[in-house]
Amino acid sequence: DYSSKFNRFTVFSKNEIPIYYAIKLNFIDTEIGILKRHMPIRVIDNYKVAIRPVEFDDFSRILNMPKVNAGTIEYNSMMEYLTVSGMSLTELVTMSDEYYGAVKTEIQNLSRSNNLFNSLDKCRQLIKSNAAGSNILRYILLKMRHRIMRYQIADRPNNWISYLCLWNECIPFDRMPFDASLVYHNPSLFDIFSCISSKGREHEILSRKIRINTEQNIKLFTPIKDVEYIGNVEELANKFNTLLISKHVPVRSLVIEKDKVYIKGYEADTVTIINDLISRVGKGLAGYRNAMGTWLQETPTVDCEEKKSILLDMFSKYDLALIYGAAGTGKTTLIKHLSSYFADSSKLFLANTNPAKENLRRQIKVSNSEFSTIASCSPLVNGNNYDIVFIDECSTVDNAAMKELLKKLNCRLLVLVGDVYQIRSIKFGNWFSLARYFLPSNIVYELNTPYRSKHSSMVELWNKVRSLDERTEEYIAIQHYASELDDSIFVREDSDEIILCLNYDGLYGINNINRFLQNDNQSPAVYWDSWIYKVGDPVIFSENNRFYPTLYNNLKGWIRHIKKETAAIQFD
């Protein structure tokens, strides 16, 4: 339920392993040859579907039916059936009467308990009659995950959803599963297609297409001609809008205008944010330029002419500043200089992620400063009026979060910092890339000089990549920055070097490559749960407030000693 991408490991099997339910498995450790080296791998030699008791407890609570006992023959026979057949419970309850009846009879002839099939019978009856809640049941039967179901369970039967114990917030998914979510859960399109027919749901698919185009491609307005293959766009949009529950109409409605279609809420949020920023432009601080000039003369640590020019100009005419720049161009350094200048003023530093917040906290040691993530800043911004607020990582802040923040934020000066080429916000966020085009040009500052490398050819490569120069590959080849992948990557040339991987999973993912590299460590292996640790292994700490500030995100170290006991393990 709480698995981390850092804690997954890859196993191999000659069989197609069921992907929807929890399984029990046995695996053996062995090796394969890759790049003239031995890579440790794990191979599954036996497995069985084993939906956990907590998941059947959730299922029974949703149906308001007696609990299914995982110790019964009925339960174990069903797990055996799911393992051998490879079917899902959704497929089983939607089978013909003859097939379903045969499976039910075979299992019940072996068992005295019938709680499981009583629950499946109720699901089958609701699904076959297409009753309210049937699409939710189809999906739950497919997934049966505690981390999904626990958020859907209401404390009493809901008459709007066939008296199932489900919250009203589940209703949008039941009505339009191809373009709605459950409570705290966004089903994948693959899973939806696996359990619900798309016939007659073209209006949902149209809305989903527009939403994905907006959120993932940052394309607020989609040309109608791009989605005409789905059907009559105007008719589908009207059908979608009429099926929305009333509180979602201002946010999710599809709007057609000038041969374009867009989602009303996304457009409205963008306009709201831009208008709010325009209202904050102001007229600057009286005497700021002279005061900053004096401070710069007395502060020899500011030795960059680019930053001096920006600092002199920043609040001389306006109360708002936007700072754009790639990694390593000195955005944080500029924030540090401003913080020092405003040392006696109240300051709030906000970032979208905890690592970025902690980085600011470590870098900026100035009095009258508070630090927070945007998600946790309400206690700080509600009712408070700061002299200056800094918001870092702006390109990763989605529109909805920024709109809500600006509603509550009271400050004399506002500094927005980010890189439009950085990883985008998870949800739709176009405000930071658009803001510069709607605000006075002389409140927008761009840092262009990278300071993390003085190697001119590396800087040139960086510039080509950022500008999507079509000659980038040619330049990489000329400078010999790329080579054939071979076993030289496993020869350590520096104690602090790393290998970058494209993902966490798979044969060449971070987790598997870590095991590959660990194989070179000749220290004795210490086994704990499904993991192997060795003295001398390098470690990196992920987000953990348990020992902050002694241990912080991305802190690096090495295992020097391991003490293993019966129920505990200690690392030095």
Regions found by a protein language model. Name each.
Residues 1-287:
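N-terminal accessory nucleic-acid engagement/regulatory domains that precede
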Residues 263-267, 304, 350, 506-507, ...:
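Conserved phosphate/pyrophosphate-binding and hydrolysis machinery centered on Walker-type P-loop NTPases
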Residues 286-299:
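Conserved adenine-nucleotide phosphate-binding loops and their immediately adjacent elements
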Residues 299-317:
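Pre-Walker A adenine-sensing motif
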Residues 309-311, 421-552, 556-560:
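Conserved helicase motor core of P-loop NTPases
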Residues 312-316, 321-477:
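ASCE P-loop NTPase helicase motor core
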Residues 565-569:
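Short aromatic-glycine-enriched beta-strand elements
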